């Protein structure tokens, strides 16, 4: 219970928080995407369309940031977005929830980063952030802002020019547009609103989560087998006790009823202890990495509880029935 809950609910928590940050962070009226990449001049063309107040292209990629110190130092992957336009234009279509500094100075040699990365790298506004661009090039831009919605949007935000020459594909993947009409923007790519874009991203995240769920299922299955074997051996070791109960007048139904209550007690204690261990692990972990509490889907947690109770009941009842046959 503890192991499976920790693995599964860690992912559901991250997905739930990321989805919430994405929905709250995109303030654009329209989101234009294209799996093959948007036209090079997509942002310029969109900005010239009637009614458009701001159009910002995003080049999404990954960078590496050194975190820790001494023997505990390592390179941490961070989602990065290269912004076409100024920080002021970005603020019109994306709310990064800036905690320190300002996006107004965002530009060549200057970046904004998520607060979790700032804590991990022990840097703040005014410091230099050492990082490795996608092609391995080292850079040390100045941090001009620290924000809070990096999990749902991007951990590192920098100007597009700083990334364009260091990625395998220099085409923007997303275009955020404030104002204008979706019909006119359709010439640039697939147009949707914030809700539709967030739903699509959430679906992609759920499809990618199956590897985590599979690992949790396999490891949880091994733990369940060990627990079931323990319960089965415990019941078989009590064959004389069960026989004595039958000899003193207890009916087969009464003995099985007693064992069912015992299995219910064992499963309840296991669920409570497992939940407590998972909570003790998840709460500080999620608070430290996201600043929010873990998200536990009620139906998923209920299925874990039902599975624990069902396994305990079967592991006790089936061997008990076999042991009681000789006393029938």
PLM feature segments, named:
Residues 1-117, 127:
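Juxtamembrane segments of multi-pass membrane proteins
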Residues 190-223, 236-237:
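Peri-transmembrane interface segments
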Residues 24-27, 146-181, 192-198:
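Small-residue transmembrane helix packing/gating motifs
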Residues 2-3, 209-229, 266-274, 300-304, ...:
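Alpha-helical transmembrane segments of integral membrane proteins
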Residues 100-162:
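Hydrophobic secondary-structure segments that place a key small or acidic residue at a functional site
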Residues 5, 9-13, 225-230, 276, ...:
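Transmembrane alpha-helix boundary/anchor motif
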Residues 226-271:
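Interfacial "coupling" helices/loops that link adjacent transmembrane helices in transporter permeases
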Residues 269-310, 317-328:
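Short helix-loop junctions at transmembrane helix boundaries
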């Amino acid at each position: 219970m503890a192991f499976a809950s920790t693995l599964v609910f860690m992912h559901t928590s991250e997905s739930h928080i990321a989805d919430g940050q994405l929905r709250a962070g995109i303030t654009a009226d329209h989101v234009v995407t294209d799996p093959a990449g948007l036209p090079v001049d997509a942002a310029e063309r969109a900005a010239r369309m009637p009614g458009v107040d701001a159009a910002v292209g995003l080049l999404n990629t990954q960078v590496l940031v050194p975190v820790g110190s001494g023997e505990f130092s390592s390179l941490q992957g961070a989602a990065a977005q290269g912004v076409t336009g100024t920080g002021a234009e970005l603020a019109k279509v994306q709310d990064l929830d800036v905690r320190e500094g300002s996006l107004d100075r965002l530009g060549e040699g200057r970046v904004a980063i998520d607060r979790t990365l700032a804590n991990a790298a022990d840097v703040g506004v005014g410091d230099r952030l050492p990082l490795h661009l996608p092609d391995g090039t080292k850079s040390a831009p100045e941090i001009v802002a620290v924000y809070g919605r990096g999990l749902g949007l991007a951990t590192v935000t920098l100007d597009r020019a700083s990334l364009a020459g260091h990625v395998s594909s220099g085409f923007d993947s997303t275009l955020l547009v404030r104002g204008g009409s979706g019909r006119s923007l359709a010439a640039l790519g697939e147009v949707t609103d914030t809700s539709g874009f967030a739903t699509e991203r959430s679906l992609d995240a759920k499809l990618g989560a199956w590897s985590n769920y599979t690992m949790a299922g396999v490891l949880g299955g091994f733990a369940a087998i060990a627990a079931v074997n323990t319960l089965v051996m415990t019941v078989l070791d009590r064959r004389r006790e069960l026989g004595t109960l039958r000899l003193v007048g207890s009916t087969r139904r009464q003995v099985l009823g007693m064992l069912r209550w015992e299995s219910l007690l064992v499963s309840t204690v296991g669920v409570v202890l497992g939940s407590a261990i998972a909570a003790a692990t998840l709460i500080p972990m999620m608070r430290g990495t996201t600043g929010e509490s873990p998200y536990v889907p009620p139906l998923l947690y209920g299925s874990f509880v039902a599975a624990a109770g069902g396994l305990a009941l079967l592991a006790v009842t089936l061997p008990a029935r076999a042991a009681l046959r000789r006393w029938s």
